[in-house]
Each structure stands twice: as C-alpha cells, then as structure tokens.
C-alpha cells in the first residue's frame, strides 16, 4: 500500500511540474489517504503482535 502511495505522490509531483494542478491535487489526496491507511494497518498489526506475544508467554 505504501508503494501505491509513493506512486501517486510521484504522479502528483510530475503533474504539478507540468501545470496540471487538478490532477496533482487529486493524486496527492489519494496518496495521503493510502499513506494513512497503511500507517493505521501497521499500528493495528503492531498492537496485535504485542498482544499475541504476551498471550504466548
């Protein structure tokens, strides 16, 4: 998912460079949403992993 966020970020930079501000803002918004989803999933799995290790001990 972070890969797609990076792809949309690069698309946003390139579109902004060439003057396509609508495309740039749309791609940046998608990249931001995907990044926050990836961070939320990472934190969720981190917490689940900590609880799993504690339950095994």
From Swiss-Prot:
**Membrane topology value:** Multi-pass membrane protein
Q: Specify the signal sequence span.
A: none
Transmembrane among keywords = yes
Give the matching InterPro entries: DUF1328 (IPR009760)
Q: Where exactly are the transmembrane stretches of this chain?
A: 4-24, 33-53
Keyword annotations for this protein? Cell membrane, Membrane, Transmembrane, Transmembrane helix
Q: Name one Pfam family in it.
A: DUF1328
The record's Gene Ontology cellular component field reads: plasma membrane
Which compartments does it reside in? Cell membrane
* Keyword Membrane annotated: yes
The record's NCBIfam families line, in alphabetical order, gives: PRK13682.1-1 (NF010226), PRK13682.2-5 (NF010234)
In the record, the note on similarity to other proteins reads:
Belongs to the UPF0391 family.
State the protein's name: UPF0391 membrane protein Tbd_2239
Q: Which organism is it from?
A: Thiobacillus denitrificans (strain ATCC 25259 / T1)
